[in-house]
């Protein structure tokens, strides 16, 4: 850590490919104070509730929690990223596809009752879904949570 309230991406205990992608492709070299404050707990695998203003980087903290868990702590496990709206799910899938693709992880989306989603839901390392879809999966798929090591709830109100 560079100083109180700051954190250089290069110093994070994450795989080199993740740090390189953040700095190179996304231009992120230093975390914002709310992100830096959350990282010790995230990197320790603790449960975290992050409340911060809009555009303060909460999603990046969630992404890093997912990558740390799937690439370091529980290799071969899966993640679920729950959002309230289909439009937000699409946005998160785009961002996660770029970041996860750089490290060999796949991302799937679950936003409706389309049967074509079924196989993709099972195969995805990271599943982004609406809260309604998540509820449906819990009720209708007995073994849905098997292998899941991290769950992110975004935009809870």
Question: Whereabouts are the PLM-identified features?
Answer:
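Interdomain "pre-motor" coupling segment immediately N-terminal to P-loop NTPase/helicase cores
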Residues: 1-11
């Amino acid at each position: 850590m560079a100083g109180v309230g700051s954190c250089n991406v290069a110093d994070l205990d994450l795989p080199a490919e993740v740090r390189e992608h953040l700095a190179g492709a996304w231009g992120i070299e230093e975390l914002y104070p709310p992100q830096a404050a959350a990282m010790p707990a995230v990197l320790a695998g603790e449960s975290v509730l992050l409340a911060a203003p809009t555009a303060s980087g909460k999603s990046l903290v969630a992404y890093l929690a997912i990558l740390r868990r799937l690439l370091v702590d529980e290799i071969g496990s899966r993640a679920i990223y729950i959002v309230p709206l289909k439009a937000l799910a699409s946005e998160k899938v785009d961002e996660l596809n770029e970041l996860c693709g750089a490290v060999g992880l796949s991302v799937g989306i679950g936003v409706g009752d389309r049967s074509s989603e079924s196989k993709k839901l099972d195969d995805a390392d990271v599943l982004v879904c609406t809260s309604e879809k998540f509820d449906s999966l819990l009720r209708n798929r007995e073994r849905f949570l098997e292998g899941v090591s991290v769950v992110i709830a975004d935009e809870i109100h």
